[in-house]
Amino acid sequence: MVYLPTLLFSLGEGAVVPLIPVIAASRGATLASAGLIASALVVGQLCGNIPAGWLVSRVGERYTMVIAGALSLIGVVAGALAPSLVVFTVAVFVVGMSAAAFGLARHAFMTTRVPVEFRARALSLLGGSFRAGMFVGPFLAAALLALFHTENAALWFFVVLLVALILLVLFGPDPEAQAAAADRDAGDVEDTGEAVSGSIPTIERAGVFRTMWRNRGVLGRLGLAAASLSAVRSARQVVLPLWGVSIGLDASSIALVVGVSGAIDFALFYASGQVMDRFGRLWAALPAMVLMGAGFLVLSLTHDASTNVLWFGMIAAVLGVGNGLSSGILLTLGADVAPQSEPAAFLGSWRTLTDAGGAIAPLLFSGIAAISSLAIGAAAMGAIGIIGAVGFLRFIPRFVPRRTLP
């Protein structure tokens, strides 16, 4: 009941996300406007993380998932039936906010309930469930397009998955209740009949913004390093296709290279968790950042080389390895440094930082490429990767001490 809802949501999201600009353009948007409408999903995720932290702390993970699923359902149906581009944009924004709440609910549950000895493997598997959906979703969308000849088919497919998800969460086994019952059983002690003296401690509910302020040190240091990882990951999705176009490859060749890179990435998601649980978080984060940072730096030097196509393929594979090695690291680090009594508010801030890094990087790369060149833009992404590696090297030992690791 932890991974299946994530897979269902990500399958639907993966089927719809590539088609958002296409649907917008088919309804009269210009190419520039279609890009802005597609960005409403990321903006919704950024805006949704902090409110989601508040919601999880008030109603719990299970009901947050139900609320997020219901809001997504409303958003997707509104998108399918939208009479105007404004309504469609709002619908995309709502789906983004709901995705943030859904993801944070699972993250918070795993943070409090999964033993630290195999936390990284569990969270890497959670991240792998999301990656599986985002990887398979576009292929399902292509099949639906071929079958029904309309982009709305992917939206209605998402609706079906959301209905199944809501029913599963409402009526399936509740891992939250099961874990709480296990905790009560483990905590049972013999009643000696003696009076209890002294005060009984209670958990203070700090609130979202007070939690952010109390944890400003870790958020401003390790959180920014994590945001740089998210930035480099996101840049990969933009740099590789544009680089392929700039060196003269056709669309099918670019798709093949990017697809192979994605397959390598997906194949390594569980290995990342094994490395983190056995050797420590730094042994996954540092190689991943060094590989991706160095990969972008090397790529920036190969644009005009006679073997640029070969270099493009090799660097795409290296970036896939780096991204795969980092699978689950942001979830795991967030869980490691979150207050264990009430992590949701902190995780909302943590995920806002990492999502912001992922949102800013493509804009930064595009801006640098527009005023200079793709090579300089790629080099800038490589520099962010190396700086992030230094940040992890400095701050993971400081904020994730060895006592939290096996």
Q: Model features per residue range: what roles?
A:
Residues 48-60, 268-281:
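Helix-to-loop junctions at the C-terminal end of transmembrane segments
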Residues 13, 95-106, 318-330:
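Core transmembrane helices of Major Facilitator Superfamily
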Residues 1-42, 221, 225, 233-243, ...:
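Helix-loop boundary and gating motifs at the non-cytosolic
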Residues 60, 81-83, 280, 302-306:
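Helix-breaking motifs and short loop linkers at transmembrane-helix boundaries and internal kinks
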Residues 63-77, 283-298:
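Structural signature of the two symmetry-related core transmembrane helices
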Residues 154-170, 378-394:
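Symmetry-related core transmembrane helices of the 12-TM Major Facilitator Superfamily/SLC fold
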Residues 176-222:
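Juxtamembrane intracellular "pre-TM" segments in multi-pass secondary transporters
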Residues 93-130:
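Cytoplasmic helix-loop-helix junction between adjacent transmembrane helices
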